[in-house]
Amino acid sequence: LNLAEADIDPAWQEIDYGDLDGMPIEQWRAVAAPQFAAFRHDLAALAPPNGETWLAFRDRVLAAWQALLDYPDDSHLLLVTHGGVLRVILPTVLGMPLNASFPLHIPFASFSRLQLRTSKEGLRATLLFHNAAAYALPAAENPDQ
């Protein structure tokens, strides 16, 4: 991996949670719970104070996704990003509504592999595997087993 050739593209950053960033998780859950409950039915419901709305986040990530059309077929890209970004990309690939992504388990340091092909119709993607890191750990180290 030659990081000298790495591009850092802010379009792939996690959603800006505004005032919720840095808040202890227990407090964050209490404050954000009503928004996340409403979000399951209305994408516009997630709008952290002084942060990025889910709709703006979705549009930013999907624009970056479409920019992958600029790469030639058979390119190999490594995208290092956050769970929120995957909650936009994976449902897009799988044809799921974006607010139905919460059943997808996306733990820290997991990785997914997508195969992308471009055509006149646009970008076609296939999910080859998801959440491989959870299965790479021995059972004693993996709290999900």
Map each language-model feature to its residues.
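Generic beta-sheet signal
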Residues: 67-68, 75-81
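Ser/Thr-centric signal marking residues that sit
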Residues: 53, 81, 112
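Acidic, low-complexity terminal tails and accessory targeting/binding regions
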Residues: 3, 15-27, 70-75, 91-145
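Non-transmembrane alpha-helical segments in soluble domains
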Residues: 58, 62-65, 69, 90
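Phosphate-handling substructures
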Residues: 1-62, 141, 145
